[in-house]
């Protein structure tokens, strides 16, 4: 930074405190605790804070040192007070705008503080000094962040002079990085807001990593929440799935709020992610059959997760609820690709046999929030009703969403007879049928949507109910909601409790 300075060269040392202890202003903390204490007292700066961060000696009292009429002073001429040199370019800036950026304010104050006992008066002198021939002091600003381009930095500086400059989604990462370097707090938060409202499969990775880099918890939380809802229905259908960081994926898989159409759909999404990690030259989204053929091509003497390449992926697949996959065709497919260790599949099969022998009782499930069977429906604008029939251990249920008016919805589940199904023979072909009149079920219904960029969540309590085959016992409690948000992510989690 080049600052226009009308002063003559002066001695570097100056007196601080009543004991006339000499200090060097370029070194805020030289080890002289007594002198530092006296200087903090004279400047009305917290001593403990300066010990933690000596740079606060330069910028912590900006608002007190400079009167409001200077900070709000309009630009009187085209001549700049400061020339900032960075990124191979010179930027002309004016003093009233500098104090929105802590970095620029710090550099400016360091120049003013050189041998000067009254920075407030000195600031007035510098502002009034418009004559040519002024000496220049150079303080370079080094920017090593590759995200900060000239365009992004120019946008950040433009925000010093103009309110609400439009920030394009394509440029927001660079502007965020520039705002962080400049310590331009209001602009940084504006960028965070733009990013939180602009989450898509193509932006989620970079926005999440930016949140982690700058420790911006609201941004990382927004990314995690968005992924919980969109991993299976949206990201899991696009090539951008490859870019999802493993850490983020693990957090999402562990979340009890994760939305999926079924456990098998979640498994397919995860298999696709692994395939894309191992085939990073693939430019198009693969067919699921291609993924199955790839994993089937490995030697059969060892399951994929037992291989060196699969060992670090085990924590991801431990998050799956494999006991929720009950269709014989799906289980046979998992055996064929030789992906899971044999012990995992044996345990799943044993649990299924035990449940069938005991009328559907799921003795292996202890916690509804982390082990329940889960199904989901994505309720879009065009739907008035949206339902799906599911089968589990010989019992048939319909999960259903109903739109009552433009903002009113309800969601429930209902036990049905297998003979009531349309095309019944195709639905329960090779499927056991239970003749039990009642089935004890513990369940929870949840609906989530966004309104003005903020998530709304509705849910029932955990309810235990005996489901019969006739009304009213065949129907669950209904989750009734009022919202303008679309789409609505409706999740049904349930366990067949011990009878």
From Swiss-Prot:
Residues 143-199 form the BTB domain. CDD domains: BACK_BTBD16, BTB_POZ_BTBD16. It comes from the Eukaryota. InterPro entries: BTB_BTBDG, BTBD16, BTBD16_C, SKP1/BTB/POZ_sf. Pfam families: BTB_BTBDG (PF23998), BTBD16_C (PF21059). PANTHER family: BTB/POZ DOMAIN-CONTAINING PROTEIN 16, BTB_POZ DOMAIN-CONTAINING PROTEIN 16. This is BTB/POZ domain-containing protein 16. It comes from Bos taurus. The gene is BTBD16.
């Amino acid at each position: 930074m080049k600052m226009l300075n009308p002063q003559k060269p002066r001695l570097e040392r100056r007196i601080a405190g009543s004991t006339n202890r000499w200090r060097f202003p370029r070194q805020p903390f030289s080890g002289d605790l007594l002198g530092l204490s006296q200087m903090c007292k004279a400047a009305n700066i917290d001593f403990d804070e300066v010990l933690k961060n000596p740079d606060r000696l330069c910028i912590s009292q900006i608002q007190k040192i400079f009167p409001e009429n200077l900070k709000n002073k309009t630009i009187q001429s085209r001549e700049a007070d400061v020339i900032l040199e960075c990124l191979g370019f010179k930027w002309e800036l004016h003093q009233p705008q500098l104090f929105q950026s802590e970095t620029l304010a710090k550099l400016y104050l360091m120049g003013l503080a050189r041998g000067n006992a009254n920075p407030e008066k000195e600031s007035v002198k510098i502002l009034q000094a418009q004559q040519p021939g002024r000496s220049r002091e150079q303080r370079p600003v080094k920017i090593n962040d590759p995200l900060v381009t000239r365009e992004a930095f120019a946008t950040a500086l433009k925000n010093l002079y103009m309110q609400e400059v439009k920030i394009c989604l394509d440029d927001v990462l660079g502007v965020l990085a520039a705002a962080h370097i400049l310590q331009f707090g209001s602009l940084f938060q504006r960028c965070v807001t733009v990013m939180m409202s602009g989450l898509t499969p193509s932006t989620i990775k970079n926005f999440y990593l930016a949140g982690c880099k700058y420790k911006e918890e609201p941004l990382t939380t927004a990314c995690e929440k968005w992924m919980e809802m969109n991993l299976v229905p949206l990201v899991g259908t696009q090539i951008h799935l490859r870019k999802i960081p493993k850490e983020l994926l693990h957090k999402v898989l562990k979340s009890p709020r994760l939305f999926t159409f079924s456990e098998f759909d979640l498994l397919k999404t995860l298999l696709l992610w692994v395939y894309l990690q191992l085939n990073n030259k693939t430019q198009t989204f693969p067919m699921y059959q291609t993924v199955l053929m790839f994993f089937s091509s490995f030697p059969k003497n060892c399951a994929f997760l037992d291989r060196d390449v699969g060992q670090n992926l085990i924590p991801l697949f431990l998050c799956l609820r494999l006991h929720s996959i009950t269709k014989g065709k799906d289980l046979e497919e998992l055996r064929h690709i030789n992906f899971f260790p044999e012990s995992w599949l044996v345990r799943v099969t044993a649990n299924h046999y035990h449940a069938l022998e005991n009328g559907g009782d799921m003795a292996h499930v202890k916690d509804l929030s982390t082990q329940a069977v889960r199904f989901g429906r994505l309720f879009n604008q065009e739907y008035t009703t949206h339902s799906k029939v599911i089968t589990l251990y010989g019992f048939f249920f319909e999960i259903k969403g109903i739109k009552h008016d433009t903002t009113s919805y309800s969601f429930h589940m209902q036990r049905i007879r297998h003979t009531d199904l349309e095309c019944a023979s195709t639905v329960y072909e090779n499927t056991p049928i239970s003749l039990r009149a009642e089935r004890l079920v513990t369940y929870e219904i949840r609906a989530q949507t966004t309104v003005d960029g903020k998530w709304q969540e509705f849910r029932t309590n955990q309810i235990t109910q005996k489901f019969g085959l006739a009304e009213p016992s065949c129907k669950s409690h209904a989750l009734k909601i009022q919202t303008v948000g679309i789409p609505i992510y409706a999740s049904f989690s349930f366990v067949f409790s011990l009878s």
